[in-house]
């Protein structure tokens, strides 16, 4: 009788131990969210060693931690980001992505977390001294941009479609800047922060004082993924209020 009771006690104890182990394993394992980006846009995203680093990866990591997810980052071509997240290939995109009405037709955006400024890079001796020179009647410059970016979209509308020059699209900002250095194009339209990095790395270039356009950056998601957008926005709001996100941006873009 005592042996039977002891066996039952041991069986119950073993079952309880296995159950607790299972619960612990569930508690330790987190669902992973995949963020797609194009890591040629410093300081928002760039490659350092074998890691994708920058403002967007750090904000994404903080937001995912707040939501209770692990984060995986995929570096891919910029012009495949919208279609990739829209099809469900990625959970979300952060890539210095500007909110536009056209993109809103394809994806959902989070709340804005940063503001970008489009500027113009030229050679030191360039005849282009302002945005007005580039957009003047009779102007006939070749303008470099990164393909599928808002810089490309604006330049096509303002310059090529208006008969004021030609727009050359490149896979990334670095290739556009190298084309400028090598005399193949007359200027590059790109966001201000990566522009600073490219000018610092290439002697003989400068950024024009006049701003081309100001725009908002946000993360984007598949149109029907409203639950994740809401969670992301809630975490974003908390991390902005407690100073985490401003500190990340300040780390890479110190206030002047």
Residue spans for each PLM region:
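A ligand-binding cleft/hinge motif common to bilobed small-molecule-binding domains
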Residues: 79-80, 97-105, 153-157, 179-182, ...
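Short helix-initiation/N-cap motifs at beta->coil->alpha
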Residues: 57, 72-85, 129, 167-182, ...
């Amino acid at each position: 009788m005592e042996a039977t009771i002891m066996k039952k006690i041991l069986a119950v104890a073993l079952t309880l131990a296995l159950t607790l182990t299972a619960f612990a394993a569930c508690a330790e394992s987190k669902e992973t969210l995949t963020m797609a980006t194009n890591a040629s846009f410093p300081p928002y995203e760039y490659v350092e060693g074998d890691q994708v680093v920058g403002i967007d990866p750090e904000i994404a990591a903080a937001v995912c931690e707040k939501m209770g997810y692990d984060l995986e980052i995929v570096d891919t071509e910029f012009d495949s980001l919208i279609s990739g997240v829209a099809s469900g290939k990625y959970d979300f995109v952060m890539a210095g992505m500007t909110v536009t009405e056209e993109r809103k037709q394809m994806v959902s955006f989070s709340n804005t977390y940063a503001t970008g400024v489009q500027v113009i890079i030229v050679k030191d001796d360039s005849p282009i001294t302002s945005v007005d020179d580039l957009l003047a009647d009779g102007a006939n410059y070749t303008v470099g941009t990164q393909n599928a970016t808002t810089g490309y979209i604006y330049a096509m509308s303002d310059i090529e479609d208006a008969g004021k020059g030609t727009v050359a699209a490149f896979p990334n900002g670095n290739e556009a800047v190298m084309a400028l250095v090598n005399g193949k194009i007359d200027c590059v339209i790109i966001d201000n922060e990566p522009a600073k990095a490219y000018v610092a790395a290439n002697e003989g270039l400068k950024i024009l004082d006049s701003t081309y356009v100001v725009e908002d950056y946000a993360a984007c998601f598949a149109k029907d993924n409203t639950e994740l957008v809401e969670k992301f926005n809630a975490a974003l709001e908390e991390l902005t209020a407690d100073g985490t996100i401003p500190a990340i941006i300040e780390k890479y873009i110190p206030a002047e």
